[in-house]
Amino acid sequence: MFNIFQLKNNCLFRMDSQDVISSINDVIWIDIIQSDDNESHDIQSISEQFKINFFEIKDILKNKRFCNSKQGVYIRSFFFSYNEDNQIDNSIVSFIICNNCLYTLRESGFSVFCIYQESLNNHVLNDGNAYELLLSLFEVKIDDLTDRIEHIYETLERLSFVIMDEQQIDGYDSILEDLAKLESMSWKIHINLLDTERALQFLVRKVKLPVTQKRHANGILRGITLLLPYNECIFQKVSFLTQSVMGLINIEQNRIIKIFSIVFLPPTLIASSYGMNFEFMPELKWSFGYPSAIFLMILTGLAPYLYFKYKKWL
């Protein structure tokens, strides 16, 4: 399927595909989403009217992330999308700017595009050109990444109170699982920010942008420059909390080993004493010798445990 947008009074309006084909000159954005055979005729018709060859563009974008040619500007950039398992991942979106029209080639499940297209009235294009629209999409992407970074920070703060609590911690596995997910998300955000920075630097340095859009691109770049160290701090905090949890797990394991040593060492000593092959061992001839040995083993195992527990050494 595909979405087609027209610019009226500096605002975007979603158009019906059949209506647009008859008035193609006003189109500023064609968002192509997993086009199938049933729509190939319409796409071919649009391609002919716009004089753009999508098959040739796909060949160009296979070898290059960015390209500026006489035919147009081509950019491939990472955006967050949801995969089949409903997990967030970095996926490629292809952008083509040709004859003041923005083409986007992507799969479904990209949250930034859904957010942008659901609130078209909030996005006014003052200059009304395709570069302004492209930068608006990048700006929404950065806002989305910023929100995700803030969410990671809030989650880490909550986990910090749980991990650093003086009480004994239960559920180490779930905490480590949460931290692993946060670390993965933070890394994906880092890659996404770096990729967006490269795309914007390409636009600023290699493309002849209008003055307003060049200023807009530089502003987004400054925002990315501020976000990268912040996200790096988040990444380091995730690593610190992971190491803290691993340290607490080691302490808990040592405590368990200590309990086993305290409880089982004295009974083992008694049992091994009566395993010695001496000729004179009076207890072996007692009728109550065996129960006495069992009782003594239990007593010597329980007494040190209770004493250590009383002294709060365990």
Curated annotation (Swiss-Prot):
GO terms for molecular function: cobalt ion transmembrane transporter activity; magnesium ion transmembrane transporter activity; nickel cation transmembrane transporter activity. The chain crosses the membrane at residues 256-276, 288-308. Keywords: Cell inner membrane, Cell membrane, Ion transport, Magnesium, Membrane, Transmembrane, Transmembrane helix, Transport. It comes from the Bacteria. Homopentamer. In the absence of Mg(2+), interactions between subunits are weakened, and dimers, trimers and tetramers can be observed in vitro. Mediates influx of magnesium ions. Alternates between open and closed states. Activated by low cytoplasmic Mg(2+) levels. Inactive when cytoplasmic Mg(2+) levels are high. This is Magnesium transport protein CorA. The gene is corA.
